[in-house]
Amino acid sequence: MAFYAAYHQDGRNKASHFIGVPMIILSLFIPLAWLRFDIGGVPVTAAMIFAGVVLAYYFVLDVPLALAMLAVNALLIWAGHQIAGLGAAQGWAWFAVFFVGGWIIQLVGHAFEGRKPALADNLFQIFVAPIFLAAEVFFALGYKPALHEAVQRRAQLSRAQSAESSTSLPRTSSRSGASGSRSA
């Protein structure tokens, strides 16, 4: 979580993710709701299976946060199924609105942050985003203050190391290659 937090320190960026991340999740649940199966006589959709796998990971990390994510996912799955029930044309249109809109909102947030999205460096961070947002709410309510402090400390250290490594790289002038001369 500290890796993800290092990319999300600006309040405006965090706020954008509270809007954008659920929009993207909802968008994915729409086409996944069209894939229906019977497992032991129980009708399920690919949206339910996908959410179940991700939630299993969250339960390994933290049970109270996973329970919160279970509630959020249940609402998003329900909404995804409702939209999917409108038919393919409307479903795909809403998918596009939520998916593209969610990414645009997050990218605006990252412009405020002045940093690229975490998933640009580690694709797995796409699964961390939802539980990170749940943790932010829980931390604001006083949940596990020691964990919150440790995450923030590691995030700040990661940002400092990233800034240090980016400033320690040799810089080249755009003119140095054109003139053929080298400065000492």
Sequence positions of predicted segments:
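Structural signature of hydrophobic alpha-helical transmembrane segments
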Residues: 33-49, 92-97
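Membrane-helix interface segments
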Residues: 62-67, 89-92, 119
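Transmembrane alpha-helical segments that form the membrane-embedded catalytic/substrate-channel core
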Residues: 52-65, 69, 82, 98-115, ...
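Membrane-proximal soluble regions of multi-pass membrane proteins
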Residues: 2-7, 111-170
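Membrane interfacial helix-start motif at the N-side
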Residues: 1-22, 28-31, 54-64, 112, ...
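Cytoplasmic-side transmembrane-helix entry/capping segments in multi-pass membrane proteins
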Residues: 66-75, 121-123
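Hydrophobic, membrane-inserted alpha-helices
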Residues: 26-29, 49-57, 73-80
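Long, low-complexity, intrinsically disordered segments
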Residues: 170-184
